[in-house]
């Protein structure tokens, strides 16, 4: 079967924003204008097509990145049909894992900002993730019809807060209730959309007289940015020649693809203005799969690097980036094809797990409606039904040409709670439900506490765990009692010590003999976490016993010493010891290693580390004193304050243990007018009084 859309007409994009910037409405409008969706879904009444999980409808926030396919030929039908695959990304900080995951499979992104709120803390996190994966992006300043909307202020914030180089290619005509359209700076024309048909048609008009000067200024700024793309354009520009419309677009595209500039558009999705022109910008300035670097992978045996180009002729390779459970068809594995072609019914290799998988049915999703297709090709995003072993981040590839595309890195959870099923019947169902949820979301962990036999779940924040418990109830009908949230503390040391460990047993028959000297030293935080060195010379301990010493130390690391929390940031070297020809064994050296580590650890100035969160609170000015006072009471350190159009943003670092129930407290302090966002920043040493309380409560259990 031949390719319907040439790969150069593909755009794999993400739409990314913080909560309430209007991302879901923007996506809805895209689906409307691309002709897929005929009735506009409004988030206000919970009917948005992209928000297809039930709690998203209730909370009005987007949780799962659903992938949707749409076609666009331009506002004035000026392009050949382009296929736009949209990955919807969540804006809430507890779901950064989803954002990270979708950034991995995108070629470009549209960053949606609120014209009133501007660049929010969450936008900065998403921006950093987009930088990490070198994703070219354009900005869409939404909500131009709202009170306090200011387009150029947001442009300035993109520059100062994100350290980016914004280049507006449009200006807003009016703002708030007087917002009527946009000026296209490339054509130097005003665009007005027809309100009667929800913006499906439009007309060009002359630039309003009172905006002529401003438009000229920003047009020059844009042309200068375009001219910097090449010497040829620069010479023409400096020689006083006018750049043609084509040359301006070509220059802007080249620089946007290299991430040197970020093109800024504006509008109001709710009022059906601007999304249409932003879609044109997606086609003109964001990359096709062939415009981005070929993906690098490794061949398993020797780690030899391999490259896969976005071509149908190359061997098949794809990355599974999301697992979702569909009530009707079971497991859906969303994957992005980087090279080659795969047909339904083909058998492929899951190279990370080393297992073969049969691709049953392939579907393309339109939010949560499914369209079954027979094949997918390089550049496509689709979902396979019924893959058994694939988890997020796995590579699927041609059996004859194995490759592992880079693994995604997932953060460690910072908060855990105990779960108790309400009835005996729930017990078994809970195990199945948690297994499914953990497969979908790698930042969510499940284990059984050995002492209490309780099931423990851990994740990236309170909201993250709330939603997972909620999903268990809705999707799997499992009712559970949830314990108090527990903070994931860590243990480490502050000085270097040397410690002997001796394990000798003589009780008739063969004895046990293991004897080691360990040097235990602190490592830089945030590095490897644990390093083991073998410094034995002259065979005082035979080589075959060294891994057993390492194993003994590692078991102790896992169980902790001070208060049974995992130990991090230590280097352990075994440098001396002795053995017995008959009595020495692996188990004896394992025990000796564990004993030496445990004793040495307590002499090496052990400390407890606690997770510190980065908090940003937006509050009206009159509550600022209360908010700061409250953060100080929570052992917070205030980093700084910014003015916003509606008050102040306070930036602080606060221990996670002090943040439980903060949402409720903040609401009551500010009569519901303040909002906050929180993300994990780092581990740092807990004060002595806090450590003492935690250690005592852990050791009395």
Curated annotation (Swiss-Prot):
Keywords: Cytoplasm, Elongation factor, GTP-binding, Nucleotide-binding, Protein biosynthesis. GTP binds at residues 17-24, 88-92, 142-145. InterPro entries: EFG_II, EFG_III, EFG_III/V, EFG_IV, EFG_V, EFG_V-like, EFTu-like_2, G_TR_CS. Residues 8-290 form the tr-type G domain. GO terms for molecular function: GTP binding; GTPase activity; guanosine tetraphosphate binding; translation elongation factor activity. PROSITE patterns: G_TR_1, G_TR_2. Pfam families: EFG_C, EFG_III, EFG_IV, GTP_EFTU, GTP_EFTU_D2. GO terms for cellular component: cytoplasm. Its main location: cytoplasm. GO terms for biological process: ribosome disassembly. It is found in: Cytoplasm. NCBIfam families: EF-G, PRK12740.1-5, small_GTP. Belongs to the TRAFAC class translation factor GTPase superfamily. Classic translation factor GTPase family. EF-G/EF-2 subfamily. Catalyzes the GTP-dependent ribosomal translocation step during translation elongation. During this step, the ribosome changes from the pre-translocational (PRE) to the post-translocational (POST) state as the newly formed A-site-bound peptidyl-tRNA and P-site-bound deacylated tRNA move to the P and E sites, respectively. Catalyzes the coordinated movement of the two tRNA molecules, the mRNA and conformational changes in the ribosome. This is Elongation factor G. It comes from Hamiltonella defensa subsp. Acyrthosiphon pisum (strain 5AT). The lineage of its organism: Bacteria, Pseudomonadati, Pseudomonadota, Gammaproteobacteria, Enterobacterales. The gene is fusA.
């Amino acid at each position: 079967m031949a390719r319907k859309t040439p790969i150069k007409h593909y755009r794999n994009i993400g739409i990314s924003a913080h909560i309430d910037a209007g991302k879901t409405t923007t996506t809805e409008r895209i689906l409307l204008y691309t002709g897929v969706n005929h009735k506009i879904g409004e988030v206000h009444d919970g009917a948005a097509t992209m928000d297809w999980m039930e709690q998203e409808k209730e909370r009005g926030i987007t949780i799962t990145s659903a992938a949707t396919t749409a076609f666009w030929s331009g506002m004035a039908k000026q392009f050949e049909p382009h296929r736009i695959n949209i990955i919807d990304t969540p804006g809430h900080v507890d779901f950064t894992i989803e954002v990270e995951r979708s950034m991995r499979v995108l070629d470009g992104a549209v960053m949606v900002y609120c014209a009133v709120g501007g660049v929010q803390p969450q936008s900065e996190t998403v921006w950093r993730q987009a930088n990490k994966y070198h994703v070219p992006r354009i900005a869409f300043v939404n909500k131009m019809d709202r009170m306090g909307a200011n387009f150029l202020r947001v442009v300035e914030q993109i520059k100062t807060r994100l350290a980016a180089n914004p280049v507006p290619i449009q200006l807003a005509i009016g703002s708030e209730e007087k917002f009527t359209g946009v000026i296209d700076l490339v054509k130097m024309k005003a665009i007005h959309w027809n309100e009667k048909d929800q913006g499906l048609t439009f007309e060009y008009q002359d630039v309003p007289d009172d905006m002529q000067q401003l438009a000229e200024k920003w047009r020059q700024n844009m042309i200068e940015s375009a001219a910097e793309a090449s010497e040829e354009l620069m010479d023409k520009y400096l020689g006083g020649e006018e750049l043609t419309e084509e040359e301006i677009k070509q220059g802007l595209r080249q620089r946007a693809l290299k991430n040197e500039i970020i093109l800024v558009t504006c509008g109001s999705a709710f009022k059906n203005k601007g999304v249409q022109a932003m879609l044109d910008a997606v086609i003109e300035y964001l990359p096709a799969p062939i415009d981005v670097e070929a993906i690098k992978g490794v061949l398993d045996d020797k780690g030899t690097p391999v490259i896969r180009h976005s071509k149908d002729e190359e061997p098949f390779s794809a990355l599974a980036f999301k697992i979702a459970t569909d009530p009707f068809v079971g497991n859906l594995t969303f994957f992005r094809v980087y090279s080659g072609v795969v047909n339904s019914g083909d058998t492929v290799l899951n190279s990370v797990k080393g297992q073969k998988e049969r691709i049953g049915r392939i579907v393309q999703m339109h939010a949560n409606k499914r369209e079954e297709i027979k094949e997918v090709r390089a550049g496509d995003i689709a979902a396979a039904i019924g893959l058994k072993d694939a988890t997020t981040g796995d590579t699927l590839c041609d059996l004859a040409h194995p490759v592992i595309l880079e693994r995604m890195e997932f953060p460690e959870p910072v908060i855990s709670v105990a779960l108790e099923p309400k009835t005996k019947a729930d017990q078994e169902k809970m195990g199945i439900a948690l297994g499914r949820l953990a497969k979908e979301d790698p930042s969510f962990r499940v284990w059984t506490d050995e002492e209490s036999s309780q099931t423990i779940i851990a994740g990236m924040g309170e909201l993250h765990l709330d939603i997972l418990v909620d999903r268990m109830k809705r999707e799997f009908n499992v009712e559970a009692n949830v314990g108090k949230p527990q903070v994931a503390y860590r243990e480490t040391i502050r000085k270097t010590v040397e410690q002997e460990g001796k394990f000798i047993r003589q009780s008739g028959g063969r004895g046990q003999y293991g004897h080691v000297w360990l040097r235990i030293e602190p490592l830089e935080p945030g590095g490897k976490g644990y390093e083991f060195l073998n410094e034995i010379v002259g065979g005082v301990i035979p080589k075959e016993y060294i891994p057993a010493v390492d194993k003994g130390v590692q078991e102790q690391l896992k169980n902790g010493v001070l208060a049974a929390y995992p130990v991090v940031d230590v280097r352990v070297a075994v440098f001396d010891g002795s053995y017995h020809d008959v009595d020495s064994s692996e188990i004896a050296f394992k025990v000796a290693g564990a004993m030496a580590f445990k004793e040495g650890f307590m002499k090496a100035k052990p400390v407890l580390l606690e997770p510190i969160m980065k908090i940003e609170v937006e509050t009206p000015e009159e509550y600022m004193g209360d908010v700061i006072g409250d953060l100080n009471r929570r052992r917070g350190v205030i980093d700084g304050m910014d003015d916003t159009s509606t008050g102040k943003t306070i930036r602080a670092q606060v221990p996670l243990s002090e943040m439980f129930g903060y949402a409720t407290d903040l609401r009551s302090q500010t009569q519901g007018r303040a909002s906050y966002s929180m993300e994990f920043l780092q581990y740092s040493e807990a004060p002595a009084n806090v450590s003492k309380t935690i250690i005592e409560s852990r050791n009395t259990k």
